[in-house]
Amino acid sequence: MSQDGSIRRTPEEAADRANQLIQGTFAGVLGMEFTLLSSDRVEATLKVRQEHKQPWGILHGGAVMTLADTVAGAGAYMNLAPGQETVTVELKINLIGAVREGVIRAEATPLHRGKPTSIW
């Protein structure tokens, strides 16, 4: 861990630490797992479980959206100065395919890094 107590380490170490930190949170309860976490790229996975599905057996869009929000938020966090916080201002998704089983993967890279906002 860095001196300021943050999770800023190697991308793999940061992902391991983030996986510990999300235990007991919404992302952790859903079963998300970070695989890479850096200021330039974030990757995470979610193994589809029955409780992630809508009544018709398809992965719920809210689970997909939560995974997307989580990786984007983690990327924004990795670019903050110590003591700063981040929240999602806007989030949009187009779901163009159905998933019934397996593992979904999300990756985020920065499109814009500004002082008040960033786009991932």
Q: Model segments located where?
A:
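Terminal targeting signals and extreme-terminal segments of soluble enzymes
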Residues: 1-120
